[in-house]
Amino acid sequence: MAKEIKFSEEARRAMLRGVDKLADAVKVTLGPKGRNVVLEKKFGSPLITNDGVTIAKEIELEDPFENMGAKLVAEVASKTNDVAGDGTTTATVLAQAMIREGLKNVTAGANPMGIRKGIEKAVAVAVEELKAISKPIQGKESIAQVAAISAADEEVGQLIAEAMERVGNDGVITLEESKGFATELDVVEGMQFDRGYVSPYMITDTEKMEAVLENPYILITDKKVSSIQEILPILEQVVQQGRPLLIIAEDVEGEALATLVVNKLRGTFNAVAVKAPGFGDRRKAMLEDIAILTGGEVISEELGRELKSATIASLGRASKVVVTKENTTIVEGAGDSKRIKARINQIRAQLEETTSEFDREKLQERLAKLAGGVAVIKVGAATETELKERKLRIEDALNSTRAAVEEGIVAGGGTALMNVYSKVAAIEAEGDEATGVKIVLRAIEEPVRQIAQTAGLEGSIIVERLKTEKPGIGFNAATGEWVDMIEAGIVDPTKVTRSALQNAASVAAMFLTTEAVVADKPEENKGGNPGMPDMGGMM
């Protein structure tokens, strides 16, 4: 396919048009009075959202050069979302401001490489200063404030704060769609995995269709159990103790399953069998987690252990186990707290090393199950459209809160960026490098200016006053008042603000140093369908 090439000014101008189209669509959502954007969906109702990255990902422009510019800025939003989980609109606004300002100077004859150096220098100073003014997040109230600001909803803030309090900072908090109108929190304490009973004859509560075992022993193995002879010795020992038994195995079938069911129905003893969770190496790791949590051992031939040789000492224990058709929950495992802590640290180390998003998610889940539990926020709304929009907002709020716990908080509403203004302005630089610093200075005013504009105010007036106010004092666009932002609960996670600035600068520097752009030449459609050969054309 033939290619079309554009050079220097022409190339950058074409890409800038794409940058502006995307950024203008995204930036209207910024601030407490930000507007929504409606996205067409090929199937189902349209999606209404104010989430920057969701909007950016939807935009495809017809002109290939404009589209490349748009995609570059979409990359800023996407990268910020990956790192911090929020702040995508701020990142887009910063990137657009740096690109526009930089392009003016490049057009006027400045050297793009000098500008790039200046931008990098300024951003490094700004990031250091942001870290210096960052405050650690303390208590449930601070967490609720961060979440409420991100979701623009105080009720959501309280829910997330409660969820984090219940399952700890390492706990897993997931979002599900609720059947009703209300948004509520459901916490599963203990370890839960997605495997249910092998046979419905094992249930103890026919009304709830679940098997509840009080103070049971837990047999953990990675083998398939089909012969009753294999587990007979351990069954006899458990029966003597007069306590129920949970069997976690690759599978329980045939004669072994029939014997367990018959004895359960006769009331001789109570045993429930479930399949082991996960697959392959992940299954081995999860079985080991369960063993450590319950104080038992994994009986595996790989470790030279046979089921026949299992004793009561090899079994795990818990205060309660609830098994439904789909899930098994182990509450209060009797494992040694030191071993559990060591296992948690081991998983944390793996988390830091992994590069796979899927592995990270699975390790995070395992960590949560060992550390305390899983919280589920069930999102409710009146219509499907509102539900999708609300779910996206809560997801952002959740990411924002995690980022705040990790790196602390700074004043929100663009105030923190204005607070680092003087430090960046004090950088000593000359020539084009100084121009790069000025570009960053102009860009860090932009979020405040945009927040003021969406609130129907003159942005420049707010920006100029902010430069003279003492640090931490900012403009609350929701009420139109000047307040101490942190005291008023208007805060941003440091990680979100830092990532937005770094990613915007990175893409702006790449954009300004672009000298040629290559795109596919659109094929001309000659029109009309060609007839099939020897058939006199199409009918």
UniProtKB/Swiss-Prot annotation:
The keyword Lyase does not apply. It is an enzyme of class 5 (isomerase). GO terms for cellular component: cytoplasm. ATP binds at residues 29-32, 86-90, 413, 476-478, 492. GO terms for biological process: protein refolding. Induction: By heat shock. The keyword Isomerase applies. It comes from the Bacteria. CDD domains: GroEL. Its EC number is 5.6.1.7. Together with its co-chaperonin GroES, plays an essential role in assisting protein folding. The GroEL-GroES system forms a nano-cage that allows encapsulation of the non-native substrate proteins and provides a physical environment optimized to promote and accelerate protein folding. Belongs to the chaperonin (HSP60) family. Forms a cylinder of 14 subunits composed of two heptameric rings stacked back-to-back. Interacts with the co-chaperonin GroES. This is Chaperonin GroEL. The lineage of its organism: Bacteria, Bacillati, Bacillota, Bacilli, Bacillales. The gene is groEL.
